[in-house]
């Protein structure tokens, strides 16, 4: 067990479906939420709002396989396969009808999970992840998705690539210990292998697009107005197709959960306290 600089976050490992998965959880509460790590970060991305979200909800945050410090399995490196693993994680922790918080790469996985398992998840909070068809991504992320020469990334210094990506955090002062956790998460071949997930977007996002109108799970979408990596049009794309959704565009860049942590946490807490149920009961958009 590793206790971070925030003593309320105690990181541990659990074997789920044969994989070593890093997780942290808060104290027990009546409601449950599963938080999925963004990329190229780790579950520590939720540290700025952990205490607030944990006040009334039992939190389980995980590094998805191949991300953060969790073990990778090549067969899971796509949103659709990862969505099935998300359900396995919920089962492993005994989370009945949990809320899901899934920014960035977790967005498509959570939506696939909701589409494939109606009624299993209470609600989703998503955003800042590629979902639009055709792709609507900033030039750097688009290159990671579409560049045919994966070996060029394999030859590059992964710590430098991740450090460059983290310059997109503009307001939040990232603690050195958290920065090192992010950098060490993708050392060796871990960054280039994690790219395989987003490189399935051209094949998998059209499948997800066709499933969105069938998703009955209520979805809160949070996007950053100044997001240059995954422009807000991705959130608008979801909102137009999901029958029970709410879209909020906040004053932040890509890393809304860190740069806009206060606004993000407020939206999530309002959502969990009853807004999700109102959206679920409302007539489809």
Predicted regions: what is each one?
Residues 16, 24, 61-102, 266:
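Active-site loop/oxyanion-hole signature of alpha/beta-hydrolase fold enzymes
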Residues 19-69:
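Conserved HGGG/HGGXW glycine-rich cap/lid loop of the alpha/beta-hydrolase fold
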Residues 102, 106, 110:
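Gly/Ala-rich beta-loop-alpha elbow adjacent to hydrolase catalytic centers
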Residues 135-137, 155-214:
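Conserved alpha/beta-hydrolase catalytic His-Asp/Glu region
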Residues 244-285:
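Catalytic active-site module of serine/aspartate enzymes centered on a nucleophile-bearing elbow/loop
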Residues 2-20:
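N-terminal cap/lid segment of alpha/beta-hydrolase-fold proteins
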Residues 115, 121-153:
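Flexible "cap/lid" loop of the alpha/beta hydrolase fold
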Residues 190-240, 251:
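Conserved serine/cysteine hydrolase catalytic core
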């Amino acid at each position: 067990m590793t206790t971070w600089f925030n003593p309320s976050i105690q990181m541990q490992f659990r074997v789920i479906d044969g994989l070593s998965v890093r997780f942290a959880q808060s104290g027990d509460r009546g409601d449950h939420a599963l938080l999925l790590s963004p990329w190229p970060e780790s579950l520590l991305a939720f540290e700025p709002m952990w205490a607030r979200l944990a006040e009334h909800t039992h939190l389980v945050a995980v590094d998805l396989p191949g991300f953060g410090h969790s073990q990778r399995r090549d067969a899971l490196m796509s949103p659709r396969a990862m969505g099935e693993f998300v359900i396995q994680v919920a089962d492993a922790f005994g989370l009945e009808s949990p809320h899901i918080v899934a920014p960035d790469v977790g967005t498509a996985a959570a939506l696939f999970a909701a589409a494939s398992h109606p009624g299993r998840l209470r609600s989703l909070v998503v955003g800042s992840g590629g979902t639009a068809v055709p792709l609507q991504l900033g030039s750097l992320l688009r290159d990671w998705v579409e560049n045919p020469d994966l070996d060029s990334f394999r030859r590059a210094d992964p710590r430098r690539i991740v450090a460059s990506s983290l310059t997109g955090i503009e307001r939040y002062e990232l603690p050195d210990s958290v920065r090192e956790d992010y950098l060490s998460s993708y050392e060796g071949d871990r960054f280039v292998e994690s790219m395989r997930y987003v490189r399935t977007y051209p094949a998998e996002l059209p499948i997800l697009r066709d499933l969105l109108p069938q998703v009955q799970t209520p979805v809160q979408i949070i996007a950053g107005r100044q997001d240059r990596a995954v422009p807000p049009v991705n959130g608008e794309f979801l909102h137009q197709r999901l029958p029970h959704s709410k879209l909020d565009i906040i004053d932040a860049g890509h890393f809304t959960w860190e740069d806009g942590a206060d606004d993000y946490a407020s939206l999530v807490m309002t959502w969990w306290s009853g807004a999700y149920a109102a959206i679920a009961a409302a007539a489809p958009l």
